[in-house]
């Protein structure tokens, strides 16, 4: 759970880290439930169809569905990233690649280390189009 990772220092963010400091497990579960029920909107981003196709191919090649399941819907502690903001996906993948983010037991760091900037761009285009 991302909130726990902020609280325990496995993820760092100047805003989120202090906000999670006093949260109980029940508080975090309540917040997670609330946000998981919100409908994602991504009206401003216009994906490039060619990049989406390349993103689908790269997702298949790197076996993203093994952890994130089909269409990046997530499971257990593996987050749903379908429909996530393009810029967030790019930043997250680059952070894993640079080992600036390490709350993944090494899985995402390992996968991201194989991605080029073009791969990251294409994956972000694809992921941002999913619901």
What does each model-found stretch correspond to?
Residues 10, 38-42, 71, 100, ...:
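A general structural signal marking secondary-structure boundaries and capping sites
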Residues 43, 47-70, 85:
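Sequence/structural segment immediately N-terminal to covalent heme-attachment motifs in c-type
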Residues 1-13, 17-22, 71-98, 109, ...:
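Gly/Gly-Pro-rich "capping" loops immediately C-terminal to redox-active cysteine motifs
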Residues 31, 35, 61-71, 123:
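The canonical Cys-X-X-Cys-His
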Residues 21-43, 87, 113-131:
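C-terminal capping alpha-helices of c-type cytochrome domains
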Residues 1-51:
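Extracytoplasmic c-type cytochrome modules immediately beyond a signal peptide or single-pass transmembrane anchor
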Residues 6, 34-35, 59, 96, ...:
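Conserved hydrophobic/aromatic "anchor" residues
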């Amino acid at each position: 759970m991302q909130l726990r990772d902020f609280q325990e220092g496995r993820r760092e963010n100047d805003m989120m880290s202090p906000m999670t400091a006093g949260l109980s497990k029940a508080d975090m579960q309540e917040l997670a439930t609330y946000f998981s029920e919100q409908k994602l909107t991504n009206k401003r981003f216009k994906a490039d169809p060619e990049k989406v196709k390349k993103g689908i191919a790269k997702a298949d090649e790197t076996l993203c569905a093994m952890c994130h399941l089909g269409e990046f819907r997530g499971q257990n502690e593996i987050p749903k990233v379908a429909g996530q903001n393009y810029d967030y996906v790019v930043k997250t993948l680059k952070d894993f690649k640079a080992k600036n983010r390490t709350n993944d037991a090494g899985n995402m760091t390992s996968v991201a280390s194989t991605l080029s900037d073009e791969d990251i761009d294409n994956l972000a285009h694809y992921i941002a189009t999913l619901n």
